[in-house]
Amino acid sequence: MKLIVGLGNYGSQYEATRHNAGWIALDQLIEKYGFTQQKNEHNSIIFFSTVNNEKVLFVKPQTYMNNSGIAIQAIMHYYKIEIKDLVILHDEKDFPVGKNQFKMNGSAAGHNGIKSVIQYLGTQNFNRYRIGIGQPEQGWKIIDWVLSKFKPEELENIILASKSISNFVNDWTKGTTFQNIMNLYN
């Protein structure tokens, strides 16, 4: 079983914001692969799918960004998912919009959602897909920047970039290692 989690904040006021880039990318995967069932459990919306005979859970935590680790830990425990079978999709302010990258592990680098995941999983060794949202424009505070909405052309760029890597789920469920996913898609 594979677990793909998009980090974000719930509520209409957060739709299309930079901090919800993980949810935007996850929506593209759900659209491509579909789902057979949807549940609200473990402080999350879980979309159940099957790709190449492998069960895949697409998850949107409903804990707000800074507490995402609570939901992810609960899901991993309940469904007995190993850390190697987890990918977190999240915004990355150190990349310009349009630059995205798979990564196998590392620190939170100031990202409070990732900090929560590290805290609750007890490790920073998990797979990620970092989605560039750009640095704050001059005069912006970081918190205001990440909670600001994408410009229309930026949002389109995020959606196109997410669609372009969506085949990683197909490769991953066929047994391609995450190292090879990085080599193929980065």
Swiss-Prot record:
GO terms for biological process: protein quality control for misfolded or incompletely synthesized proteins; rescue of stalled ribosome. One of its GO terms (molecular function) is peptidyl-tRNA hydrolase activity. InterPro entries: Pept_tRNA_hydro, Pept_tRNA_hydro_CS, Pept_tRNA_hydro_sf. Its main location: cytoplasm. Pfam families: Pept_tRNA_hydro (PF01195). Belongs to the PTH family. This is Peptidyl-tRNA hydrolase. It comes from Mesoplasma florum (strain ATCC 33453 / NBRC 100688 / NCTC 11704 / L1). The lineage of its organism: Bacteria, Bacillati, Mycoplasmatota, Mollicutes, Entomoplasmatales.
